[in-house]
């Protein structure tokens, strides 16, 4: 083979992945006596300005987790439906279809006009679960919740970002996800108590309360932010 035509032998993808992870990178030099963990401060990880949006996320994410945790047991134990995955399929497909329309509504009419109908759709989906009698109810619930959660989630993230200055966006994002984690943890316990004491149907109906409160609080915060931005 002529010298100009030689080529490297084929290598497995793992070799090139290893090269990418071990490639030398330039690391900023630390000052003498400066700790490598010096930048890890609570103020950099948590934004107190975003506490209200965090509380909203506790309520909303807790509800989403409660649906996921208890719906399969409810369908099997009370209705004898073993394969409830069609609910998640309906929610995902409807979210994929509705997301562009919700984005246009958010751009044209603003977050409040998007949040209120999304909250109504989500609450209606929960009530469908509470009154479910067969698989059709779960499909309808998945469609309604798919629309609702894809309208609520972007607005809640927007609120977190708007409550802090530009240099605090990362801390606000961290605070936002902290609320989601707390909500997920609480839902398993509180929802479990509700379902054990009052039954699954009452538990799903009760999940409407935190959703309504979360939407109401979000509307209040957004109204206040818009007023501040107009007067600034």
Locate the predicted segments by residue.
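Conserved extracellular-gate-facing transmembrane-helix segments in secondary transporters
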Residues: 56-68
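Intracellular juxtamembrane helix-capping segments at the cytosolic ends
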Residues: 151-164
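Helix-to-loop junctions at the C-terminal end of transmembrane segments
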Residues: 98-110, 195-196
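C-terminal membrane-cytosol helix-exit motif in multi-pass small-molecule transporters
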Residues: 4, 9-29, 217-222
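Juxtamembrane intracellular "pre-TM" segments in multi-pass secondary transporters
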Residues: 22-57
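Short amphipathic helix-loop junctions that connect adjacent transmembrane helices
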Residues: 69-83
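A membrane-interface helix-boundary motif in multi-pass transporters
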Residues: 1-10, 193-211
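Structural signature of the two symmetry-related core transmembrane helices
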Residues: 9, 113-128, 208
